[in-house]
Amino acid sequence: MSDSHARLERLTSMLRRRGVILPAFEIHGGVAGLFDFGPIGGRLRRRLKNAWLEHWSSHGNIVEIDSPTITPESVLIASGHVGEFNDYMSECIACNGAFRSDHLVEGFHPNPDILTADELNSIISENSIPCPSCQTPEWKSAQPMNLMFETRIGAMKGGRTAYMRPETAQGMFMLFPALYRHFRNRLPFGAVQSGKGYRNEISPRQGMIRLREFNMAELEYFIDPETKPAHDFSKWNDVTFSLVPDPEFGGPVEMTPGKASAENIIRHPTVAWFMARTWDFLVDVGIHPSKIRFRQHEGTEMA
């Protein structure tokens, strides 16, 4: 077991002992990827959520909304989730165990998330990676598996196909016309939402990092691309951020958000400003500044 996995195991064990998180439905055997928040965890989650909502709502032109967790199929077809919201799954020939292909090749590639099915198959085959359950190194070809939980709205025969939302963004985008009217047809404005999301993970692990039901908190901010924003970065003149760009464009840098915006390291001033405000929130809730970094997605990681 690696040091990072050992630390995660110790942390998860401590959280369980102290009533922060507990395995859900444990007396019936439990379900991987589902957790209860215990007496301490429930209070912590509520306080963190309230702090987050207050942090962004105090901005003035950001409002709170609450969208349904059941989403019609047509919405998720338009967003690309029905066709593309997939992880690759590898099935063991011997025991029929199913595992995420990118998890199997961790340690054999620096960024397994970006690999294609053929690349995953090659790494698994070339390294004779054993099945975590039965140790047999024989696998079927990696196949895409859609991660959304499907359901139906209405009677089963005439019901409308829908999904439990995999993220909160779609409901927020659907509300844009109403929000635009609320702000008297003027940009910029934003909306925040917190709530449940659902993903049918192939092989949940990493404690609370990969869950089948989880809590999300999201902000969407809408701007006029033709209007140059005027953000004041003076508050962060003495604060340097750890910025990790796409490796194609250079290595990590340390600089203030204002300088990063001026030098086009962060390509839009509004993005830089929200990164700075996010940094404020994280520090306010107790995260040490030295532990915070902002990493740009690589081109192959983009949704």
Where are these regions (language model features)?
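TRNA-recognition modules of translation machinery and tRNA-sensing kinases, especially anticodon-binding
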Residues: 2-303
